[in-house]
Amino acid sequence: MAEDKTKPSELDQGKYDADDNVKIICLGDSAVGKSKLMERFLMDGFQPQQLSTYALTLYKHTATVDGRTILVDFWDTAGQERFQSMHASYYHKAHACIMVFDVQRKVTYRNLSTWYTELREFRPEIPCIVVANKIDDINVTQKSFNFAKKFSLPLYFVSAADGTNVVKLFNDAIRLAVSYKQNSQDFMDEIFQELENFSLEQEEEDVPDQEQSSSIETPSEEAASPHS
């Protein structure tokens, strides 16, 4: 495992409120090729950070969308998926999701419904792309995967091994994330913002009157004396 060189501040998700930052999460069973897809897309220009404390791998990427420079963080599960559930912070402030299954392992396709249900619990509105990975057999692309059709989700046939459709997949995911951020306010974002505002109000109310008044300066007798 790579050394964890990440400072705590680098996991501050407040940065995703900035206009030029987006967060894209990857979901799916173990060994479906999520990490391999990201590495294929980023090629040699990536330095994945293993955040062992948070059980995730963070991939940073800079993209250009409509002439704007966008800083993209791709979040990978780094083993959490073996528990068939992710921590709520993994979904927090995500702007798009890439959900992957292995066309050669039917169980990974069946488990998409579990991942999608959890995604919508935390992020009801963000765009989600379904990815059929490991299409070594071209006949696979002729199969009908009804899950994507059922939920009106885009379906991409890709191969991490030879790169088929990988660049298009990630570029489209970035564009969807940017578009979502510009044009929509997720219900869960509103809830989190309300909770943050409430916490700040509570902190202000808890400050003792003596502490609040301690910053008010009163003139000393020496300063008030006309003979000083």
Curated annotation (Swiss-Prot):
Changing Q80L: GTP-locked form; interacts with the intraflagellar transport (IFT) complex B via the IFT74-IFT81 heterodimer. Localizes to the base of the cilium and accumulates within the cilium and at the tip in specific puncta. One of its GO terms (biological process) is cilium assembly. The keyword Transmembrane does not apply. Gene3D superfamilies: P-loop containing nucleotide triphosphate hydrolases. It comes from the Eukaryota. One of its GO terms (molecular function) is GTP binding. GTP binds at residues 28-35, 76-80, 133-136. Keywords: Cell projection, Cilium, Cilium biogenesis/degradation, Cytoplasm, Cytoskeleton, GTP-binding, Nucleotide-binding. It is found in: Cytoplasm, Cytoskeleton, Microtubule organizing center, Centrosome, Centriole; Cytoplasm, Cytoskeleton, Cilium basal body; Cytoplasm. The keyword Cytoplasm applies. Expressed in the testis. SUPFAM superfamilies: P-loop containing nucleoside triphosphate hydrolases. Changing S35N: GDP-locked form; mild defects in ciliary assembly. Loss of interaction with the intraflagellar transport (IFT) complex B via the IFT74-IFT81 heterodimer. Loss of interaction with CEP19. Loss of localization to the centrosome. GO terms for cellular component: centriole; ciliary basal body; cytoplasm; endomembrane system; pericentriolar material. Pfam families: Ras. Belongs to the small GTPase superfamily. Rab family. Interacts (in its GTP-bound form) with CEP19 (via residues 121-150); this interaction is required for its localization to the mother centriole and cilium basal body. Interacts (in its GTP-bound form) with the intraflagellar transport (IFT) complex B (via the IFT74-IFT81 heterodimer). Binding to CEP19 and the IFT74-IFT81 heterodimer is mutually exclusive. This is Rab-like protein 2B. It comes from Homo sapiens.
